[in-house]
Structures are given as structure tokens and as C-alpha cells.
């Protein structure tokens, strides 16, 4: 058995345990239930699909389709399909929070390394396994791929968000068992909040709250995109 096969089996097992545990413990104490996690489908030796998310285990990348929201100011990079925070989020991803988190587990991101913010605008930076965020759009041969930071503008300084690794925090479960990322409908944020699954550890993003806007000149609202998360080696 190859090392990659062993890794694949380990990741699938980890994913299955998380799904089972998350489904068990994420049951709220009201009639509303969390979304059912789609089955993990194998597309090739190192390629998987879960719902609308493509997973490349070898490259340690996940990609999910979405649409650019037409909003004024940003607090979140990506929200869930039908998520409550779409009015202040850059991209509506075609997935729910539980499925998105499951896909990230499949590329080896580990919540055991995370320091999750304990409040909105937490002054203590979040920590976690590092990742890069990329956006793809258009058709070949004009298809473009840029880092997400190039699309997030600080209106005060007229500069883009500084490039650097984002971190996997995994969100958090509330006392009643509900998964906060699913409850709030947020996947990726930059204001040091306990809700999103991926956060920006930089202080500059929090300090620029209220001034971060989408670069509409580079990528217009309504555009269909691929949101890509690439896991990086843990230092």
C-alpha cells in the first residue's frame, strides 16, 4: 500500500468519525436539524467529491463553486448557501458549513492545533493549521486565479489585505450542541470571530473593519467563481 493510500484511508476514517460525532453532538434542542452531510465520492486515486466540493488529497486542496455577492462592506469572505451573513460577505459558496468542514478534514487540517477566538473582534489572534485562499473564474484560456487578498481592498489605505496564511480554526459548538458556523452561515472570516471555520490571524484585518470592500473592478458581483483552500505545511 502506498503512503498516499494510507493517508487517504486515514483521512477518510477521520472524516467519518467527525461526521458521526458532529451529527450526534450538533443536534440542536429544537425541531430544526443540521443539514445531512453528502456522501464522500471517489473520483480518482487522489480525488474526491463531497456535495459541490472537489477534494484533491494529493495537492491538499478543496474547491467549491460560488457567486460573488453585491455588498458594500465586508466582515466575511465566504458564507454558506442561504447563509444569514450574505449581506456582509464576499462570496456565497454552494455548500453548508458541516460539509465544508468535512472537506477540510479530508485534506488534513486538524482542529487540535487551533486556538479559536472566544469573542467577536477577539484581540488575541486565532491560531491553526495554515492555508492559502484562492479565487478562480472565467473560461480557458482566459481563466484567472488570484489570491483572495488581492480582491479585498482597504478603503482607508487604498491597499489590498496583506498576503499571508489563513488559519483553520474549525469554528465551535455551542453549549446546546449547535455548530456555530452553520448557525451563523459563515465559512471564512477576518474579524477574529468564533463562528467561521477559517480565519485571518492578522491584526490588520480586524483594524480595518468597516473599510474592507470587494475589488469590483477586478471581479464583478454575480460572477461565478471557484473558491479554493490549499493546506500548507505546518511549521
Spans of model-derived segments:
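Boundary at the C-terminal end of the N-terminal hydrophobic targeting segment
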Residues: 24-28
Amino acid at each position: 500500500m502506498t503512503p498516499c493510500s494510507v493517508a487517504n484511508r486515514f483521512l477518510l476514517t477521520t472524516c467519518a468519525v467527525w461526521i458521526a460525532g458532529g451529527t450526534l453532538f450538533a443536534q440542536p434542542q429544537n425541531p430544526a436539524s443540521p443539514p445531512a452531510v453528502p456522501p464522500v465520492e471517489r473520483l480518482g486515486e487522489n480525488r474526491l467529491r463531497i456535495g459541490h466540493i472537489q477534494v484533491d488529497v494529493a495537492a491538499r486542496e478543496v474547491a467549491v463553486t460560488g457567486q460573488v455577492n453585491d455588498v458594500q462592506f465586508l466582515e466575511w469572505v465566504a458564507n454558506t448557501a442561504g447563509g444569514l451573513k450574505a449581506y456582509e460577505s464576499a462570496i456565497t459558496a454552494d455548500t453548508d458549513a458541516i460539509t465544508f468542514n468535512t472537506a477540510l478534514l479530508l485534506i488534513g487540517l486538524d482542529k487540535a492545533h487551533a486556538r479559536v477566538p472566544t469573542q467577536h473582534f477577539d484581540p488575541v489572534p486565532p491560531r491553526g493549521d495554515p492555508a492559502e485562499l484562492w479565487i478562480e473564474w472565467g473560461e480557458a484560456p482566459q481563466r484567472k486565479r488570484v489570491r483572495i487578498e488581492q480582491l479585498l481592498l482597504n478603503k482607508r489605505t487604498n491597499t489590498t489585505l496583506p498576503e499571508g496564511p489563513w488559519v483553520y480554526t474549525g469554528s465551535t459548538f455551542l453549549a446546546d450542541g449547535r455548530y456555530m458556523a452553520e448557525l451563523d452561515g459563515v465559512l471564512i472570516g477576518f474579524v477574529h470571530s468564533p463562528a467561521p471555520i477559517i480565519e485571518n490571524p492578522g491584526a490588520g484585518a480586524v483594524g480595518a473593519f468597516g473599510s474592507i470592500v470587494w475589488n469590483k473592478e477586478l471581479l464583478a458581483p454575480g460572477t461565478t467563481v471557484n473558491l479554493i483552500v490549499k493546506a500548507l505545511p505546518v511549521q
